[in-house]
Amino acid sequence: MGRPRVLSGVQPTGALHLGNWLGAIRNWVDLQDTHDTFVCVVDLHAITVPHDPARLADDTLNTAALYLACGMDPQRCSIFIQSQVAAHSELCWLLNCVTPLNWLERMIQFKEKAVKQGDNVSVGLLDYPVLMAADILLYDADLVPVGEDQKQHLELARDIAQQRINARFGSEERPVLKVPKPLILKEGARVMSLTDGRSKMSKSDPNEGSRITLLDPPELITKKIKRAKTDPKRGLEFSNPDRPETDNLLGLYAILSGKGREAAADECADMGWGQFKPLLADAAVAALEPIQARHKELMADRVELDRVLAKGRDQAESVANASLERVRDALGFAKCS
């Protein structure tokens, strides 16, 4: 029996930030040694909302390069661009044809984003969860790393696989699609905004000061941390519900400095913010320096980056096409020799 397979990805819209790294990519790096790992840049999802076509290609390559710079190893995982594997779009259509409309209309993220877009909301945004289901189910993923905001989408993928495909077109002995399970991420999965300790750090936040991106220069990192929201109390502590910003910033320091929560809490127990913030800024700059240096090397060598992504695409296609063929057969499509 082979290693369990895991599939994950992130959109290329907006710059990747500390939350993406500490909450997701860092976990993917660890999974490479124990799991059959597929990681993709989900550029098809990026166009479900208004986007800038002049930036999409560069943003996609930048995101792929950051995966590699953060420690994803093409010798131990498959890194690819979603739109370069045609099976994603075809399986999405097949799943669309068996998925009830009301399943999609109840998705919380769709409701929230539809309010923002008003009459301009696209069918693609409504269908986003079905495309995500296709992404997952194509690779026979055993596990899918998910945060709180994606749990409902994974449940939909499981329901489509089990109730709409396997139950109708397969059998208990020979299911058409593997039903994935969620992989709960370890500590550090929720990095909060620098401007609101109760909100998750997000690429979509209009306030750029709310996040530290992986490519922010040292002076900008220092500036953002200096301006980060705090409280008037002296001394830093964890797990005080009345001090969410303190919990978030101290947690970042514990991770970025490598000291861990206990040592960080002891070190900062009597500190004021004027003493602590430079320490956090230095830790963030030092942690991101090797990532930024490696990213610069990769973006300067497009031939190598293209080679890695082409290899990942080929590996992904071999798995995805086999899964797609099973679904096509189960649904009764004709074959021509």
From Swiss-Prot:
Reaction catalyzed: tRNA(Trp) + L-tryptophan + ATP = L-tryptophyl-tRNA(Trp) + AMP + diphosphate + H(+)
One Gene Ontology term, aspect cellular component: cytoplasm
Positions of short motif 'KMSKS' region: 200-204
Any one GO molecular-function label of the UniProt entry: tryptophan-tRNA ligase activity
Keyword terms, alphabetized: Aminoacyl-tRNA synthetase, ATP-binding, Cytoplasm, Ligase, Nucleotide-binding, Protein biosynthesis
EC number of the protein: 6.1.1.2
Enzyme class: ligase
Places the protein is found: Cytoplasm
GO annotation, biological process: tryptophanyl-tRNA aminoacylation
Described purpose of this protein according to its UniProt entry: Catalyzes the attachment of tryptophan to tRNA(Trp).
Family listed: Belongs to the class-I aminoacyl-tRNA synthetase family.
Name assigned to this protein: Tryptophan--tRNA ligase
Protein source organism: Parasynechococcus marenigrum (strain WH8102)
Lineage, opening ranks: Bacteria, Bacillati, Cyanobacteriota, Cyanophyceae, Synechococcales
